[in-house]
Design a protein with these regions (language model features):
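Second-shell residues forming the walls of enzyme active-site clefts
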Residues: 54, 91, 100-116, 126-128, ...
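Short, surface-exposed loop or secondary-structure junction motifs
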Residues: 696-930
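Bacterial Sec-dependent N-terminal signal peptides
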Residues: 1-33
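Short active-site loop at a secondary-structure junction
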Residues: 615-622, 643-704, 767-780, 856-859
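A short, well-structured edge-of-sheet supersecondary motif
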Residues: 89, 262, 368, 613-647, ...
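Short, conserved catalytic-motif segment at the N-terminal edge
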Residues: 594-656, 677-679, 686, 839, ...
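Short, gly/Ser/Thr-rich active-site loops of penicillin-recognizing serine hydrolases
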Residues: 361-366, 370-378, 455-461, 568-574, ...
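Preference for extracellular/luminal or secreted protein segments
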Residues: 30-65, 69-82, 295, 317-594, ...
Length: 995
């Protein structure tokens, strides 16, 4: 799933050397690369601006004030006043939205004498502060990733988003080494506890941003990772020697500075080894900011204070005095100044007292102005708010978030190679969400892979609920547990793990195979009892719909596990732990970009389906497309009916119509072929005793399956049950079920128990077509269940379910879904006004199949696009799926070939194939290769397999609603045109720089 990256020439060198970055950094960057804005070319504009500024205005350039785009006009006016009257140098934005912030930024920039430096805390991207944006993983999750190139790519994308939103500084990365599991403020915000790993990740993130025009800011100097006090609320004290600080905490700062780090944020901590002044925060310490950072470490870039409204400093000094002390300590930019006039006044007073010189102030101002020039503020342009949210949510960003998240997920236990889960036919699976009261995204993701029952245990669950749950789970062998709603910070009551949860996990490990997925702070693993005995354990680091989706895919083998623990959680779960698994075991679910297609290049699919709905060709549809086992397009459109009362869901079942032929009859025949129990060279009479002595006895199956056995196309069996008056003949149908009329044809309609024999007799006694040649026929497929049952002694559907559907997890492929599913989950077909006189929902549309009780080999199967795609992947991979060769190798590839092309019959055995080249009424997409195959269905369904390109395509609709006379779907050629859109997208792959 890894895609090539677009990176600059400098970044290419970075990528090549990332593995040896810290040992041979001179191969990647010069040992003393200066911050980018210190280049001489930015001096001219800075000099021209500073010459126009008064002393007050120069001091104000060193002040950055907080602003919120989600507050009222009073707040906006107050910020505007500070910009216009006092000329503050910058804004740090907090909570809000992209458009509101961009609009506010434009307003403020227009009234500012000097363009404003705009900043934001975006450790995991804009989402840290702004709604309606893409969320990237927490840094702790990123620390689990082995490929630093992904972090460079993230830095590049975040830089693009920041610049698109008019933001110039990202207060990231956090380079604190989190070697204290109880740290209440850093924790999940750190890349981990290993200084080399933290440095590699920070370097990649920093370079990705700065190579693309956004200033990085390493924080929190000199290292906030081993504290147990949150500096937002108090002053942490760091009791370490300077030697220890040099070896550990300062290490990543030093390495990033050597590589051109743009800025540093100084933390609020008391560090006696560096400055013994009582209750003095490092932010206010001249020995730390000037002595250590600037002089000893030689740092020349911008130095930001941490927010000056934090209690670690604010409770000791009033506004103004605090700002002056921070500037005197050596900081360049005062962040979150709470009283701008007081700050300017106190700094001027310090100047008058000769505690600071004009030269030092001017030096700081020039540095700020040069940085602004590097940021492009020397030619500022308003932010365009049109399409801003769409731009920030571009597919490239979403796919990058997926790649990062996937690479971070860490498999910590996999006893007996349990994962990916194998042999679905042999186990009964339950899912259990702890800390949740409703179906989670994790459970929904798991459900894509097979049949399972969902259970919940909320945080408030007690002993009685626990015992009840254990009883319900007693029938299951495998329980897939997700732990949800965890606290993200240390010290939050065991992260939300309750005693009852621990009891439940401990006791379940004694009676079940257990796979536990922890969606939260990785340190919470230490609070969960019994994890050393579970069969599978996955650390997900955070709880988002995406993490839950991807973890479900690891469990069933859609994707592999790659991550490694970036911290030591306990003596059992150590830093560096992480087991690998391979993906591709079952279908994966991903974005088009994963297979080299731009999402936007598939917009034609949406347009075609919407056209079909608008033209009333169909009320709705499910569409799925996969390449090489990766489902990259899976959408539901429209509604069950034109009244728009029920929207189509991806879990809804459609009547598959004639796709039943290749999904049931052909599946069984090919399975039996592999076992040596069926051969297409034999005759119908060989396998079906009732055919012997009839004109069908000697029909050869290779002719039958290619529709050239001279069988009639179809027989309207239902007409034999109806009188001229329109009423049913008394011996055929009844409105109530009984011993004689037990077979349900539709709601309140039951057929005689022996009527199937009449149907079979009518088929066997029907005349053969007088001339040889291709005539598409249902008749042999109606007989197919009897053939399979006679060969195997097993009922038709039971045979399919046991040998095909359950092993591949296609449990939604079923006959008579009304027996198993709510009607709201079954899409209706036709409003039948001739035969059944009702809306058909949950019973098969085809009359003949309905008269056989809904189970037939030519029609009757229902399913979702997802489950049908599993079967089509089995066919794509020549009978191999989820590690099992369910159909003998070579059988499907043989059956799907053109059997009688020399006779003008282009069909495979059972499968449809592209018509003769040049046929204007083709049954396949124009670009589909000759070797592709599939089938269509009368109700508006279609599926196609392309072995050359590794494609599986499924289109499900109910075009027969409300009447089968609606032929617009055919006339518009929607089904094959949708597939053609895929081919066109494949022919226009992503450029490397677009990935």
């Amino acid at each position: 799933m890894k895609s090539p990256l677009y990176i600059s020439s400098r970044a290419i060198l970075f990528a090549l050397c990332s593995g040896c970055l810290l040992l041979t950094s001179s191969l990647v960057f010069s040992q003393n690369e200066a911050p980018p804005y210190l280049d001489a070319r930015y001096r001219h504009w800075a000099d021209s601006v500073i010459s126009t500024l008064s002393l007050d205005e120069r001091i104000a350039q060193l002040i950055m004030i907080p602003a919120y785009s989600n507050k009222d006009q009073v707040h906006i006016d107050s910020i505007s006043q500070l910009v216009k009257k006092h000329g503050v140098g910058g804004i740090i934005f907090f909570q809000g939205g992209p458009v509101r912030q961009a609009t506010m930024t434009n307003q403020l920039q227009k009234i500012s004498k000097v363009p404003l430096m705009i900043s934001l805390d975006g450790e995991w991207g804009l989402k840290m502060r702004l709604d309606s944006t893409v969320r990237f993983p927490y840094q702790m999750a990123l620390g689990a990733i082995e490929d630093e190139n992904l972090l460079y790519e993230m830095g590049e994308e975040i830089a693009w988003q920041f610049r698109r939103t008019g933001v110039h500084v990202n207060f990231a990365p956090v380079v604190d080494i989190n070697n204290n599991a109880n740290n209440p403020v850093i924790g999940f915000r750190s890349f981990g506890e290993d200084k080399e790993n933290v440095t590699r990740k920070s370097m990649a993130y920093m370079k990705g941003m700065q190579d693309h025009g956004v200033l990085a800011s390493a924080k929190h100097f000199p290292g906030h990772g081993d504290t147990d006090v949150d500096s937002h609320y108090g002053l942490p004290v760091l009791h370490f020697s300077k030697k220890r600080l040099q070896e550990i905490e300062l290490y990543p700062f030093r390495k990033l500075m050597e590589a051109g780090l743009g800025s540093v944020m100084v933390a609020h901590m008391n560090i006696p080894a560096l400055d013994s002044t009582l209750n003095l925060a490092s932010t206010l310490s001249h020995p730390i900011v000037t002595g250590l950072l600037k002089e000893e470490m030689g740092y020349e870039g911008l130095v930001f204070t941490d927010a000056l409204n934090m209690q670690a400093v604010a409770k000791f000094y009033p506004p103004g005095v605090l700002d002056a002390k921070a500037l005197l300590a050596g900081n360049d930019i005062l962040l979150n100044t709470m009283d701008v006039p007081a700050a300017i006044r106190e700094i001027k007073a310090a100047l008058e007292r000769h505690e600071i010189t004009q030269e030092v102030i001017d030096e700081k101002v020039l540095k700020v102005l040069k940085a602004k020039a590097w940021m492009g503020l020397d030619h500022w342009k308003p932010i365009k708010t049109d399409n801003l949210i769409a731009d920030l949510n571009r597919p490239k960003a979403r796919y990058l978030s997926r790649k990062l998240t996937s690479a971070s997920l860490t498999l910590l236990r996999n006893e007996n190679d349990l994962l990916p889960v194998k042999g679905l036919e042999n186990i009964k699976i339950a899912t259990l969400s702890l800390g949740a009261a409703d179906t989670t995204a994790f459970q929904k993701g798991l459900s894509r892979y097979g049949k399972m029952s969902h259970f919940f245990f909320p945080k408030e669950g007690g002993i009685q609920e626990l015992q009840d749950l254990k009883q319900k789970l007693s029938d299951f062998q495998l329980v897939l547990v997700g732990i949800h709603g965890l606290g993200i910070r240390a010290g939050t009551n065991q992260f939300g793990i309750t005693p009852e949860m621990n009891v439940l996990i401990r006791e379940l490990t004694e009676s079940h195979s257990l796979v536990v997925s922890v969606f939260g702070n990785v340190y919470s693993l230490a609070e969960i009892q019994g994890l050393d005995k579970v069969q599978g354990l996955i650390a997900a680091y955070q709880e988002t719909p995406l993490t839950q989706d991807l973890v479900s895919q690891i469990i069933f083998g859609g994707i592999g596990a790659e991550g490694r623990l970036p911290v030591q959680v306990s003596s059992y779960f150590k830093k560096g732990n992480g087991l690998k698994t391979d993906g591709g075991f079952r279908m994966a679910y991903t974005d088009p970009e994963a297979i080299g297609i731009a999402t936007d290049n598939l917009s034609g699919i949406d347009s075609l389906v919407h056209l079909a709905i608008r033209e009333k060709a169909i009320p709705g549809a499910q569409v799925l497309v996969a390449k090489d086992g990766k489902v990259f397009y899976h959408k539901a459109f429209g509604h069950h009916t034109y009244d728009s009362l029920k929207a189509v869901d991806l879990e809804d079942l459609y009547d598959l119509a004639s796709i039943t032929k290749i999904s049931t009859s052909l599946a069984a025949f090919m399975h039996l072929k592999g076992k040596g129990q069926f051969d297409e060279g034999e005759t119908l009479g060989t396998y079906l005793s009732m055919a012997r002595g009839t004109n069908k006895e000697n029909l050869i199956y290779s002719d039958i399956l290619t529709h050239q056995a001279r069988l009639q196309s179809w027989i309207p069996f239902w007409k034999s049950t109806v009188r001229k008056s329109g009423k049913f003949k008394w011996y055929t149908m009844k409105s109530d079920s009984s011993r004689r009329f037990p077979i349900r044809v539709a709601q309140d309609l039951f057929i005689h128990r022996k009527y199937d024999q009449k149907i079979y007799k009518e088929i066997l006694e029907s005349p053969l077509n007088p001339e040889p040649g291709y005539v598409y026929s249902d008749l042999s497929f109606i007989l197919a269940p009897k053939v399979v049952e006679e060969i195997t002694g097993v009922p038709f559907f039971r045979y399919l379910d046991k040998n095909i559907y359950t092993p591949i997890g296609a449990n939604n492929l079923t006959f008579n879904p009304y027996q198993h599913y709510p009607m709201s989950e079954i899409v209706p077909s036709e409003l039948d006004e001739l035969f059944r006189k009702q809306l058909l929902q949950g019973t098969v549309h085809d009359e003949g199949a309905a008269m056989l009780g809904g189970i037939s080999g030519h029609a009757g199967l229902f399913g979702t696009a997802n489950d049908l795609a599993k079967l089509m992947h089995l066919y794509l991979y020549d009978g191999l799926y989820a590690g099992q060769q369910l159909i003998a190798a070579g059988v499907i590839s043989t059956y799907s070939k053109c059997q009688f092309c020399d006779k003008g019959n282009y069909r495979g055995m059972g499968f449809d194939r592209p018509n003769k080249p040049g046929d204007p009424n083709g049954n396949a997409a124009a670009s589909a290769p000759e070797t592709s195959f599939g089938h269509s269905g009368f109700t508006g369904t279609y599926t196609w397999i392309d072995p050359v390109n590794g494609l599986v395509y499924v289109f499900l609709s109910n075009r027969v609603y409300p009447t089968r006379e609606n032929r617009k779907l055919y006339q518009l050629n929607i089904r094959t045109e949708v597939l053609e859109q895929v081919y066109q997208a494949l022919n226009h792959p992503l450029r490397i720089k677009d990935k």
